[in-house]
UniProtKB/Swiss-Prot annotation:
Origin organism lineage: Bacteria, Pseudomonadati, Pseudomonadota, Gammaproteobacteria, Enterobacterales
Protein name as annotated: UPF0149 protein NT01EI_3357
Assigned protein family: Belongs to the UPF0149 family.
Pfam assignment, any one: UPF0149
Source organism (scientific name): Edwardsiella ictaluri (strain 93-146)
GO cellular component: cytosol
NCBIfam families: PRK01736.1, ygfB_yecA
HAMAP family: UPF0149
Length: 190
């Protein structure tokens, strides 16, 4: 598996997830972790939430837990680094067809929204740019394509949508991670 400083490999993580009986792809798991982080998670509760959502509340084996902790740390560092280093974990164009990549992006977005909703339970009340981005993500999660469509055109469109998703995730992180965001029920002293 990857080390703390090298990026997580999509195919390797997907294989480990399958071996451990977790019915998520690497894209879906990264989307879930990203959603939790962008929703404001700042403690070890993320692992319990992931166990509950993906493994019937049972802890993962060390063989899976360690790579997920590395991925969580890498994702958190990229989001908090302030250098726009955050990237979606999706299969590369050399590793998957444009259709498989579109499916992976839709899966990433679905699980991102799940993680975000776990941390921010009032997403429907969020207004402004962040609210619009969340609405757009809901539409992107329903991403469809026509298999007769020109694959080069679809690949170009997919790149643009993936970049929009990346920016929307960073926007959500900026909104919810520092202050708890408008959907937080955390009391504040004034």
């Amino acid at each position: 598996m990857s080390t703390e400083n090298s990026p997580t490999d999509y195919a390797t993580l997907t294989q480990v997830l399958q071996q451990q009986g977790v019915a998520l792809t690497a894209a879906e798991m990264h989307g879930l972790l990203s959603g939790l982080l962008c929703g404001g998670n700042r403690d070890d509760s993320w692992l319990t939430l992931v166990h509950d959502l993906t493994n019937e509340g049972m802890a993962f084996s060390q063989h899976l837990s360690q790579p997920l902790q590395v991925l969580y740390g890498q994702t958190r560092s990229a989001l908090e680094g302030g250098e726009f280093a955050f990237q979606l974990l999706l299969p590369g164009e050399d590793d998957a067809s444009v259709f498989a990549r579109a499916d992976a992006l839709a899966g990433w977005v679905n699980h991102f929204l799940l993680g975000l909703g776990m941390m921010q339970t009032k997403l429907g009340q969020v207004k402004g740019d962040v609210g619009e981005s969340i609405d757009d993500l809901r539409n992107i999660a329903q991403l469809g394509y026509d298999e007769d469509e020109d694959q080069e055109t679809l690949a170009h469109s997919l790149e643009e949508v993936a970049e929009y998703v990346r920016m929307a995730a960073m926007l959500c992180h900026g909104e919810f991670s520092c202050s708890g965001g408008p959907a937080s029920d955390t009391p504040r002293l004034h």
